Amino acid sequence: MAAVSMSVALKQALWGRRAAAVGAVSVSKVPTRLLSTSTWRLAQDQTQDTQLIAVDEKLDITTLTGVPEEHIKTRKVRIFVPARNNMQSGVNNTKKWKMEFDTRERWENPLMGWSSTADPLSNLVLTFSTKEDAVAFAEKNGWSFDVEERKVPKPKSKSYGANFSWNKRTRVSTK
């Protein structure tokens, strides 16, 4: 019965109410969904789909994640904004706050010589849009944290006329 009503609902969505009337089962209670591709409707659907779900109480999910309890309860995280890449002039990756975990014991793998660790969270980096979100997430999980404040670079004041000055270091002879 579920497969029949499912196909009728699909017919109704694709062909409208006329095709549903032809079907054997009446589906007057099934809501119709418009298959419109207008950008306004897509934007409305997207805002409805991206509502945040807030869970106030602290949930113990250690049995679900598979991470040992010693790696969850005794963690220290560092919350920071990454520095700008010196090889590029853009500042795109400096707007998000990142959270990374402290390093635990590592050893050298005797077979291959690779660095090994028993810590599943050692290479995990979490990204947040605000510092408050990162701090709230660390507190919710019971981790101690250090926050490194954002370093705002001071702009150097330069005048355009200094580019054409005669006694610039590039024009002064060194011999």
Curated annotation (Swiss-Prot):
GO biological process, one term: reactive oxygen species metabolic process
Biological role: Accessory subunit of the mitochondrial membrane respiratory chain NADH dehydrogenase (Complex I), that is believed not to be involved in catalysis. Complex I functions in the transfer of electrons from NADH to the respiratory chain. The immediate electron acceptor for the enzyme is believed to be ubiquinone.
Domain of life: Eukaryota
Name of the protein in its database record: NADH dehydrogenase [ubiquinone] iron-sulfur protein 4, mitochondrial
Localization terms from the record: Mitochondrion inner membrane
The keyword Electron transport appears for this protein: yes
Region Disordered, residue ranges: 150-175
Subunit structure and binding partners: Complex I is composed of 45 different subunits. This is a component of the iron-sulfur (IP) fragment of the enzyme.
Keyword Transport: yes
Stretch forming the transit peptide: 1-42
Family of this protein: Belongs to the complex I NDUFS4 subunit family.
Keywords: Electron transport, Membrane, Mitochondrion, Mitochondrion inner membrane, Respiratory chain, Transit peptide, Transport
Membrane topology: Peripheral membrane protein
GO cellular component: mitochondrial inner membrane; respiratory chain complex I
Species of origin: Gekko japonicus (Schlegel's Japanese gecko)
